[in-house]
From Swiss-Prot:
It comes from the Eukaryota. Residues 482-554 are annotated as: SAW. A motif (VHIID) lies at residues 307-311. Probable transcription factor involved in plant development. The gene is SCL6. Residues 396-479 are annotated as: PFYRE. This is Scarecrow-like protein 6. It is found in: Nucleus.
Length: 558
């Protein structure tokens, strides 16, 4: 689901060799800070921002030949802090002062700045959370990533409205602290070692998690004992990638065992959007998924000016903001009519998030002169809703995520009736719907370990990494564990096999799409990411482990 390549906008593969400052950057506030190199030093000047000024400008990700680049090349790509002068200025700005920095129309206050461009260090999204009462320096006194909080509920510290202005924007540096245990044993050689724990190695952790998943429904006492041991071995989300990933799966199983659901406080949306944007800047996963999906859509929309997208995976709408901009660039000679129908499950989607996404997409569309009609419907109505046949002059596209496999049979029957122009499906690499719950957990643990390894390789700002894990990856793991453990009758087959069984045929990605994806990965500052082709899917992998894949489908001709 996704965010922008904010630094470069080219026109096709031929432009990859000339990523220059001539390409405009999407604005986020009335004034943007630009840096000029003079005499080996950097100097800042303020220049008026270009139109449009939508808060979704920074959500625009590369989707076609005219917008492909990498957000890793900029100063903010890895969450680095600004210069000392900027830091001092930022430290004095509270959330209450944000309203004075931007226009007040269309709710461009706190959330507007959160979605804004991150080229100005004083407005960098990672810094929004630096001094939040929810996080303290003492939480990060151990090496590794993650918040040292065994409860780990998103509502652990509810922030009262009276303290909102205390959330200061700054660029404080996170200090790495040496493990106290290492210091202690380094100077006291005769101190007896701690009691030996039960096989704390990778194999032991994985086996215990798999066993807990096997017996969590049939033998709760045994599952509780296994998780109690894991609580001692994995007391906090710090350490190596496997240990951090295992911690989150252990927490998800604990919540499942005790029937605990996470309650979001009113400020969780701010934290989640900030983590989402940081993840897009640090990792190519989101850009790859959005770019590849949108390129397939654009190729299928050729010759149409009335477009209808049925979306089962809306996220924050960044994919569609990018697509709208691409449509304007390609078809500026003819008026465009775009309709987006969102199907969302009330159990898995927050109404505040959906409303935020809906309003901002409308605002963005109005600024680039696209006629947009967007509506949100409950997924529960899918089986009873009557859908009119589409016109021959209208292109219908469907966006699906493999993560919604529990609803996939119902969704595909509905989609088959629509007979869309194209269907795009994204797969996060952690979904193995043909496996039983315990084996699915082991596969997902391996996939998330690879994701953490890829994030560690970037060597990004520690605080940004902690926010990504807590507000983006941990909720994803909890949802995955909860959804797969529910007693729903589901066919034991892959989602690809279900597509074929329901009467859909795969569509091969164009050579242009593959070349653009390769160029995207090559712009990533670390080595280890690579693109693979598997059947009709285009995959982004880390060290041969799939992180995300995108495939395109059509209704099979009868």
């Amino acid at each position: 689901m996704p965010l922008p390549f904010e630094e470069f906008q080219g026109k096709g593969i031929s432009c990859f060799s000339s990523f220059s400052s001539s390409f405009p950057q999407p604005p986020s506030s009335p004034l943007l800070s630009h840096r000029k190199a003079r005499g080996g030093e950097e100097e800042e000047e303020e220049v008026p921002a270009a139109e449009p000024t939508s808060v979704l400008d920074s959500l625009i990700s590369p989707t076609s030949s005219s917008t492909v680049s990498s957000s890793h090349g900029g100063n903010s790509a890895v969450g680095g802090g600004g210069d000392a002068t900027t830091d001092e200025q930022c430290g004095a700005i509270g959330l209450g002062d944000w309203e004075e920095q931007v226009p007040h129309d269309h709710e461009q206050s706190i959330l507007g700045l959160i979605m804004g461009d991150s080229t100005d260090p004083s407005l960098e999204l990672n810094s929004i959370l630096q001094t939040s009462p929810t996080f303290h320096d003492s939480d990060y006194s151990s090496p590794g990533f993650g918040v040292v909080d065994t409860g780990f509920g998103l509502d652990h510290h509810s922030v009262p409205p009276s303290h909102v202005s205390g959330l200061l924007i700054n660029q404080s540096q996170t200090h790495y602290t040496q493990n106290p245990a290492a210091i202690f044993y380094g100077h006291h050689h005769h101190t007896p070692p701690p009691a030996k724990r039960l096989n704390p190695g990778p194999v032991g952790i994985t086996e215990q998690l798999v066993k807990a998943a096997e017996v969590i429904e049939s033998d709760t006492c045994l599952a509780q004992g296994i998780l109690a041991r894991l609580n001692q071995q994995l007391s906090s989300p710090v350490g190596k990638p496997l240990e951090r990933a295992a911690f989150y799966f252990k927490e998800a199983l604990n919540n499942l065992l005790h029937n605990v659901s996470q309650t979001l406080n009113p400020y969780s949306l701010i934290f989640k959007i900030a983590a989402y944007k940081s993840f897009s800047e640090i990792s190519p996963v989101l850009q790859f998924a959005n770019f590849t999906s949108n390129q397939a859509l654009l190729e299928s929309f050729h010759g149409f000016h009335r477009l209808h997208i049925i979306d089962f995976d809306i996220g924050y709408g960044g994919q569609w903001a990018s697509l709208m901009q691409e449509l304007v660039l390609r078809d500026n000679a003819a008026p465009l009519s775009l309709k987006i129908t969102v199907f969302a499950s009330p159990a898995n989607h927050d109404q505040l998030e959906l409303g935020f996404t809906q309003d901002n997409l409308k605002h963005f569309a109005s600024e680039i002169n696209i006629s947009l009609d967007i509506q949100v419907l409950s997924l529960d109505l899918l089986g009873s809703i009557s859908w009119p046949n589409s016109s021959e002059k209208e292109a219908v596209a469907v966006n699906i995520s493999a993560a919604s496999f529990s609803h996939l049979p119902l969704v595909l029957r509905f989609v088959k009736h629509l007979s869309p122009t194209i269907i795009v499906c994204s797969d996060r690499g952690c979904e193995r719907t043909d496996l039983p719950f315990s084996q699915q957990l082991a596969h997902s643990l391996h996939s998330h370990t690879a994701l953490f390894e890829s994030l560690d390789a970037v060597n990004a700002n520690l605080d940004a990494m902690q926010k990504i894990e807590r507000f983006l990856i941990q909720p994803e793991i909890e949802k995955l564990v909860l959804d797969r453990s529910r007693p729903i009758e589901r066919p034991m087959m892959t989602w690809q096999a279900m597509f074929l069984q329901m009467g859909f045929s795969p569509v091969t990605h164009s050579n242009f799409t593959e070349s653009q994806a390769e160029c995207l990965v090559q712009r990533t500052p670390v080595r280890g990411f690579h693109v693979e082709k598997k059947h009709n899917s285009l995959l982004l992998c880390w060290q041969r482990t799939e992180l995300v894949g995108v495939s395109a489908w059509r209704c099979r001709s009868s």
